[in-house]
Curated annotation (Swiss-Prot):
One of its GO terms (molecular function) is glucose-1-phosphate adenylyltransferase activity. This is Glucose-1-phosphate adenylyltransferase. Keywords: ATP-binding, Carbohydrate metabolism, Glycogen biosynthesis, Glycogen metabolism, Nucleotide-binding, Nucleotidyltransferase, Transferase. The keyword Transferase applies. The keyword Nucleotidyltransferase applies. Pathway: Glycan biosynthesis; glycogen biosynthesis. InterPro entries: ADP-Glc_PPase, ADP_Glu_pyroP_CS, GlgC_bac, GlmU/GlgC-like_hexapep, NTP_transferase_dom, Nucleotide-diphossugar_trans, Trimer_LpxA-like_sf. One of its GO terms (biological process) is glycogen biosynthetic process. It comes from Pseudothermotoga lettingae (strain ATCC BAA-301 / DSM 14385 / NBRC 107922 / TMO). Its EC number is 2.7.7.27. Homotetramer.
């Protein structure tokens, strides 16, 4: 019987999500009405029969640690195996993880104690459904030393991924991380299977190389391929999304509201599990109207909701209109509000008669590289005062208070941050 250990890299900042990851790690970002991003990778593990999982955390880990806890929602609260949180070792000569490969290197003793045949290395911030047995079976069939899951991406997106070229037998003959000019459109998903003894040797060598960035895509994998190792590409044909930008995060959530969504959250044979607060069923008042939307438990809806994802415990007041938006847990939207093309984070208070997301297209003044999709983003714990008008592609930072608003109107592309 093969022994597989999964290692989930969950220490990422997710800077391209802007204020959504200012206080939490990217894998802890809410998604799909009740989940957090890491839930999809954890659920894929247990649905694939993998019950020995290490989660490597670093950036703002507290909420993520509390969310995973002992792993009970995923049936990972086990005496043998189960889930283990693996923060950086800050004593002795070690320190913060200096790259994806270094993160695994710092946990060599943990992996050795599990004595696996194969190590499955995963990212904790992607949304997808995958039976990992498929890639492991492929890996064994090919007699591979390492296998990388991949998909074909549009040519204009190749500079966001590790890009590989293969021979007719799917063996990888060239690999380049985020090339400016790609010779292929076959992109790595950041999902790897390695024979453990083989990988361990390369991790030790990489750690001794002072010129290395200690990253799988930049250093480890290119070295393996250049030295003629048996590294293969496993083509994945299912749903997979990198929700690393505000626009892709917003789009991927709203995809779930389609009549036939690309990711089926309701598949009884492939459930996604999460740790959530117990809440009563949603209530939709006689004054409410809901069209093509996800409404989670604990919500109270008195207004109009269309093409939106509404998380747990959200309150939407009478005559309020919410369209094409993502509204996260325990946010309150007052009466007579109009919210369009927005992402509103957790525990925000939007007072009465507020308009969000309407206006002309405009370049964002805070960070035009991060806020590019004409989506208005409201950070967690903020309060939007009555009568405010917030335009398109605006940003309201984390914890913004009424006193931070110097005027009722925030022009498209502008921003408001909390002043200490």
């Amino acid at each position: 019987m093969r022994k597989v250990l999964a290692l989930i890299l969950a220490g990422g900042h997710g800077k391209r999500l802007g204020v959504l990851t200012e206080k939490i790690a990217k894998p802890a970002v809410p998604f799909g009405g009740k989940y957090r991003l890491i839930d999809f990778t954890l659920s894929n593990c247990v649905n694939s029969g993998i019950y020995h999982v290490g989660v490597l955390t670093q950036y703002r880990p507290h909420l993520l640690n509390n969310h995973i806890n002992i792993g009970r929602p995923w049936d990972l609260d086990r005496k043998k195996g189960g889930v283990t949180i693996l923060p950086p070792y800050l004593g002795g000569v070690a320190g913060w993880y200096r790259g994806t490969a270094n993160a695994v290197y710092q946990n060599i003793e943990y992996v050795d104690s599990a004595d696996p045949d194969f190590v499955l290395i995963l990212s904790g911030d992607h949304v997808y459904a995958m039976d990992y047995n498929d890639i492991i079976d492929f890996h064994i069939l090919k007699g591979a030393e390492g296998t990388i899951a991949c998909i074909e991406v549009p040519p204009e997106e190749t500079n966001r991924f590790g890009i590989m070229m293969t021979d007719l037998d799917s063996r990888i003959v060239d690999f380049e991380e985020k090339p400016q000019r790609a010779r292929s459109n076959l992109a790595s998903l950041g999902i790897y299977v390695f024979n453990w003894k083989f990988l361990k040797e390369y991790l030790i060598r990489d750690e001794q190389n002072n010129e290395s960035t200690h990253d799988f895509g930049h250093d480890i994998i290119p070295l393996m391929i250049n030295e003629g190792c048996q590294i293969y590409a496993f083509k994945f044909n299912g749903y997979w999304r990198d929700v690393g930008t505000v626009r892709s995060y917003w789009e991927s959530n709203l995809e779930l509201t389609r009549p036939i969504p690309p990711l089926n959250l309701y598949d009884r044979h492939w459930r996604f599990f999460t740790q959530t607060e117990e809440m009563p069923p949603a209530y939709c008042a006689p004054t409410s109207k809901i069209v093509n939307s996800i409404i989670s438990e604990g919500c109270e809806i008195y207004g109009f909701v269309e093409n939106s994802v509404i998380f747990q415990g959200v309150y939407i007041g009478e005559n309020a209109v919410v369209k094409n938006s993502v509204v996260m847990t325990s946010t309150k939207i007052g009466e007579n509000c109009v919210i369009t093309d927005a992402v509103i984070a957790e525990r925000v208070i939007v007072e009465n008669r507020v308009i969000i997301g309407e206006g002309d297209d405009a370049k964002n003044k805070l960070d035009s590289d991060v806020y590019t999709g004409q989506i208005t983003v409201i950070g967690m714990y903020s309060v939007i005062p009555s009568g405010s008008v917030i335009g398109k592609n605006c940003v309201v930072g984390v914890g913004v208070e009424k006193g931070d608003f110097k005027t009722q109107k925030v022009e498209s592309g502008d921003y408001i941050l909390h002043k200490e």
